[in-house]
Every structure is written in C-alpha cells, then in structure tokens.
Amino acid sequence: MTLPVPPFDPTVERSVHRISTVIATTAETVDLLRAEGRPPSEFLRLGRLEPFYIAAVQQLPRVLACRDIDADSLKFRRGESTTATVCKARLWLFDVQAGPVVAVFSVDVECAPKVLIPFLEDCYYDHVMVESSPLERYVAETLDGADVQVVASVGVTALGPQRHQMVFTSATLPEDTVQRIVYRADLDWNPVYSSIQFPAELNRRPSSGAAVGAYVSVLSAQQDYIENCALLSAVQIVAATGKIRQIRLAAYDALLRIRDLSRDRTALSTAERRAELVRINETMAEQELQLTFGVETACEIGILIPALRVENFHRQLIEYAGLTDNVSTVSAMLARLASVLGAEQASQDSIDARKQDLRRLRYGVAVGFLSVVAVPIGIILGFFGGSYREVDAERSIFDWRHYYPMYLSVLGLVFFAGAVFLFLFWRERRELGRVAGTVTP
C-alpha cells in the first residue's frame, strides 16, 4: 500500500543539538560583485524554496568549500570539562556578493540543552583547536585549498569580529532554557528587561519555536529546509556587517589621507597630489558601490525568497544586527567625505589655475619685453641695413639731426602700442566693474 505524501515537510528529527557559528573573515574574492562557488542547493536541502534560491543564485551566498572534520580531532577549552559528546563537525566557506568570505563552523553535540553554553562560548571566541591547529588557521588552510582567487592585498586570512551563532534543536525548549542559550550564561533572568525576540511566523505553531538574539539565535523543531534558509540568511547578514565595517574603516582612512594632503602641500608634487585625489575618489566610488550591492541589498530578502518564515527571521536578524542604522551612518560618512574631497579638489584646481596664471604672466612679460626691445631694434637695423636714399654711409647711425624722422617714427610706434595696451586695460577694468555692479554704464 502506498503511503500518502504529507502536505508539508516534517520537522527535523535529530538526537543531537547543532551549533553553527557564522563568522566573517578578512578574505575577499577577486570579483567583488560576483559571488564565486557553487549554489547552496547542491549541498543544502531547500525544499519548496529551492527554485527561488536558484533564480537568485548570484545575489545569495554560494558555497566555496565544505569540509567534514573528525570530531575526535576537536579540542574545546570549556567544552572539554562537560560530559557532552561531539558527534560531528563540518566547516563551510561561503562567498557573498560584494562581501567577505564567510566561515560557518558547525558541530553536532549530544548533551542537555544547557550544556551547549560552554561550546557556544568556545566557538564564539575561537577557543577551538582543529587537528592541533587554531580554528582561524584551519579556516585559512581550507580557503587556500579551495579553487578560488582571493584579493592578494588582504594577506593572511583572519576571522573578523562580526559573527552570529545558530542553535538548532529537534524539540522545543522552555523559555528559560532559551534565554540561557541566547545569552550564553546559565543564569536566571528577568523577562521584562530581555531583548530576545520571538519571530511570529516561526512561533505560530505550538510544536515549533524560534528566538533571535543579537549574537545567538535558537530554532527548535523546525523543518530542515527552514533551518538551512535561516542559516543562509545569517551568512548573508554577517557578510553585510563585515562589509559595512570595512567600508567604515576605509572611509575614515580616506579622511585621514585627505587631511594629510591638505596640511602638507609641499610634500607631494602637483601631479602626485592629483593622482592621490583620483585614487581616493575611485576608492570611495567603489565603497559606495559595495555599500549598495553588498549591504543595502542584504536588508531585504522577501523580494527574492517569498516565504513568510524566512523573511520574518531575516528581518528580525537585520534589526538585531543594526544593519539599517549602520547603513545610514556609513552613508552619511561617505556623503561628508565626498564633500571634503570635492572641496580639496576645488582647492587643488584653484592652486593649479593660479599657477597657470602666473606662468602665463611670466611668459607674457618675457615676450612683451622682447617685443618692445627687439621690434624697434629690428626696424632700426633694417633701415640702416637697406640701400635707401636716406641712409648716408658717411654718417653715424646715431646722428640725430640727420635720422630723427626715423627715430621719431619708431618711438611713435612704441608709444602707440603702449597707448593701445593702456586703453585695453582700462576697458577690461570697466567691464569687470560693470559685471560686479561697481561702475555705472
């Protein structure tokens, strides 16, 4: 007899609890506007939402590497003192459009829910050894072994401060246990002063639950594809927070470079200053592009994945990450920086224009002086060098009584040129005064 197909996927059934620590790294792929790697649907079950993820594969996280880790090779600083058993571990590397490479360190732990707290602490603060190597070095080695090109200027891959932890359980947990996991502290709480949020769409069924905190989220008795979608949302948001941190640091660095250019104008030549301003301008344009496509686009998932539970969790995590406020702050920083950069470029243009005016003045004075001296002398020498009836070979060229008509003609030409210059100068001043409104026409 054929069993009927259920109208929806069942909730996940695991005998262990899963911790997935999502960490932004300092590594970036060469093409920032195009995510490298393979579609996540090849590794993660996305259920009925898979077509939407495939359609938007270039705008969502892609898998660079997926590496299973021997559970016996793991050493936890705090977790070693518990009776828990680490059953399975895996390292994921994701690439996100216009964002850094994101590492996801997942471990399956068989224990009571509260015993997860030491493991959460170890994973969050990188107090984990993998095959006698720190987690950071293991991530760098895995990325080096992946078939992907990263930006060489970044140097050795390191784990950044932007991270979020996901806890997946196969059964719902008491609210008090949830708060202990979210705050990573086995202490009592006062619910009135708690900031933990419970997404409505993920808690609408009495048999399932979810809680979102600033750094830890808990999903209980959810369907497997919902868990995977939530993990991909966390990857995208952590990448966005890592990118906006980089943009903020780059904006501050650009401001210091502009200030140094403004303070010490003699350290660099004009060409070097202009080249530096162009480099800063190009850097800021690239940062604005990455802010739009790497951060702002991550704030909304519903237009790509039309699913209430996925969208609800994504928005809740966006709110806790403070991504919208950070976007506004960094956008204002870039706008002010553009104003400062524009003022510095205008100042440089003014200096260059003044230099051009002085250069033209020097050339004009030199050419004018040569003209005043050379033209009359040329006329005089041309007159005496010709075979004219007025030229007497027996007389000196300085004989004023004999040659005064020629000398007077040359002097008259010089004075006429001077008069024309004074007239044009007076006319120019009058026109400028009329434009400025200081001369009555």
Residue ranges and their predicted role:
Residues 91-274:
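Extended alpha-helical interaction modules
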Residues 235, 244-254, 261, 270-340:
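Structured inter-helical modules in multipass membrane proteins
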Residues 331-441:
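Hydrophobic alpha-helical transmembrane segments and their immediately adjacent juxtamembrane loops
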